[in-house]
Amino acid sequence: MIEATIEGVLPRAMYRVRSSEGRLMRVGVDAASSGIIVKLIVGDRVVVRIAARDPGRGQIVRKL
C-alpha cells in the first residue's frame, strides 16, 4: 500500500491519483471502504492498494 494524492475525478467512481513516488494511477474505492469514505476531491491524500496484475490500477483503502 502506498500514499497518493487525488489529481482528477473520472466517471464511474474512478479517480486519477499520483503516488508519492510520482507514478500516475487509475483507482477506484474499495468495496469495504465505500460506506466510510463519503466524498473525495482533488488534492485529498489517500492510501492506495496496488492491483497485483496491473501496477497502473488500484483501490483506495482509506482517506488520510
What do the PLM-derived regions correspond to, one by one?
Residues 1, 24, 35, 55:
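Short, mixed charged/polar active-site loops
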Residues 23-31:
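A short macromolecule-binding patch
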Residues 33-47:
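Short nucleic-acid-contacting surface segments enriched for D/E, G, S/T with interspersed K/R
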Residues 52-64:
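OB-fold/S1-family single-stranded nucleic acid-binding modules
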Residues 1-11:
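Structural detector for short beta-strands of small beta-barrel domains
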Residues 11-17:
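Short aromatic-glycine-enriched beta-strand elements
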